[in-house]
From Swiss-Prot:
Catalyzes the NAD(P)-dependent oxidation of 4-(phosphooxy)-L-threonine (HTP) into 2-amino-3-oxo-4-(phosphooxy)butyric acid which spontaneously decarboxylates to form 3-amino-2-oxopropyl phosphate (AHAP). Homodimer. Its cofactor is Zn(2+); Mg(2+); Co(2+). Substrate binds at residues 136-137, 274, 283, 292. The keyword Repeat does not apply. The lineage of its organism: Bacteria, Pseudomonadati, Pseudomonadota, Gammaproteobacteria, Enterobacterales. Belongs to the PdxA family. InterPro entries: PdxA, PdxA_fam. It comes from the Bacteria. One of its GO terms (biological process) is pyridoxine biosynthetic process. This is 4-hydroxythreonine-4-phosphate dehydrogenase.
Length: 329
């Protein structure tokens, strides 16, 4: 990077391991400025529980970004609504979590920050607070007024994007339309080029049905929907292979020559990726007007405040965001 950049981090659920992980991030120096959108006393209390040093520096958008010294974080303060006790969910803090996400998202939209890295939230407690919330991906899509976003998870060796995300199985076949597939593949192809630096990305596309429909004998979605869309996009120059049966696609003879896999639904592609690299994966939202990465795990309430949480996924998410910033410069 030609000059220091500034990224924003949201720790997520205050009763979970998110604050622990952010404190652990601060134990090393970073070539970018880490602005944490959170309650300051929460972070200092959690650092004391973990026995780790932490100094919170005031955030000033008018001051040029600078590399982050070890033992420090730059604080963009948002106040808790109620005390946060590790491991104990509090409905009153649901609005706090959403406020941190909104402020961080707005800062990215206003070009305050070069990227957003999110810690794990607890969807249930946010909804219990009376705030409809499906997940980070949908929240940022709506707030940024993006036309369409795509969820992709990645490890060092594998990238898996999803045509559909949090839908019940009975609704998936109807959701796989030509328009949806066209938009998802176009976004995936575009962001692999612009944010990952791949000039001509090769994308493997899963079928929807067992054996990719077996020539129409196990479902016709491949013939009616998936194949026509792939043919159209290939004619535009995209390097697409498929539809392939999901039970045979995830093997070296295919993956060694591919840049990403497009799965038709959540549990078709993600079990393989999480088996291969759980705790080292990153969730990326494609199609947003800014870079957003996230950890690939949950709030782990039972580990909060104990110093047992693994910071590996958060470090990977932050490092990937830095690489993506470089690719977009």
């Amino acid at each position: 990077m030609s000059s220091a950049q500034r990224v924003v981090i949201t720790p997520g659920e205050p009763a979970g391991i998110g604050p622990d992980l952010v404190v652990q991030l601060a134990q090393r120096a970073w070539p970018i400025e880490l602005v944490v959108c959170a309650d300051g006393p929460l972070l200092t209390e959690r650092a004391a529980m973990l026995g780790l040093p932490l100094s919170l520096l005031p955030y000033s958008p008018d001051v040029p970004a600078a590399p982050q010294p070890a033992g420090t974080l730059t604080l963009l303060p948002v106040s808790l609504r109620a005390p946060a006790i590790p491991g104990q969910l509090t409905v009153e803090n649901g609005p706090y979590v959403v406020e941190t996400l909104a402020r961080a998202c707005d800062g990215c939209l206003q070009h305050e920050f070069a990227a957003l890295i999110t810690g794990p939230v607890h969807k249930g407690v946010i909804n219990d607070a009376g705030i409809p919330f499906t997940g980070h991906t949908e929240f940022f899509e709506e707030r940024s007024q993006a036309k369409k976003v795509v969820m992709m998870l990645a490890t060092e060796a594998l990238r898996v994007a999803l045509a559909t995300t949090h839908l019940p199985l009975r609704a998936i076949a109807d959701a796989i339309t030509p328009a949806l597939l066209h938009d998802v593949i176009a976004i995936l192809h575009h962001d692999l080029r612009t944010k990952f630096g791949l000039r001509n990305p090769h994308i493997l596309v899963c079928g929807l049905n067992p054996h990719a429909g077996e020539g129409g004998h196990m479902g016709t979605e491949e013939i009616d929907t998936i194949i026509p869309v792939l043919d159209e996009l290939r004619a535009q120059g995209m390097h697409l292979t498929g539809p392939l049966p999901a039970d045979t696609l995830f093997q070296p003879k295919y993956l060694d020559h591919a840049d990403a896999v497009l799965a038709m639904y959540h549990d078709q592609g993600l079990p393989v990726l999480k088996y291969q690299g759980f705790g080292r994966g990153v969730n990326i939202t494609l199609g947003l007007p800014f870079i957003r990465t996230s950890v690939d795990h949950g709030t782990a309430l039972e580990l909060a405040g104990q110093g047992k949480a693994d910071v590996g996924s958060f470090i990977t998410a932050l490092n990937l965001a830095i690489k993506m910033i470089v690719n977009t410069q």
